[in-house]
Amino acid sequence: MILDYINSRIKILWYTDPFLISREGVIVLETEKTFLIKLEEKNKFIRIFKAHGIFEITFKGKSFIIAGYKLVRKPWKRI
């Protein structure tokens, strides 16, 4: 089973850049090391490194908290 987080909701709980903490949005693109997120406010997009944060992700109706370094790999290699 491939875990694809595109169109999942994400909230940044902790990040190396404090300006990004508490930001929420929808994941529109995922690469091996980054998420591209469409923020709710002002229809802005940001690209963040997965390894630099802790996130709350709502995936298929269930929310979970995960350290980003655990997501650093190609989506199709995750099981």
From Swiss-Prot:
It is found in: Cytoplasm. Signal peptide: none annotated. Pfam families: RNase_P-MRP_p29. Keywords: Cytoplasm, Endonuclease, Hydrolase, Nuclease, tRNA processing. Its EC number is 3.1.26.5. One of its GO terms (biological process) is tRNA 5'-leader removal. Consists of a catalytic RNA component and at least 4-5 protein subunits. This is Ribonuclease P protein component 1. It comes from Saccharolobus solfataricus (strain ATCC 35092 / DSM 1617 / JCM 11322 / P2). The lineage of its organism: Archaea, Thermoproteota, Thermoprotei, Sulfolobales, Sulfolobaceae. The gene is rnp1.
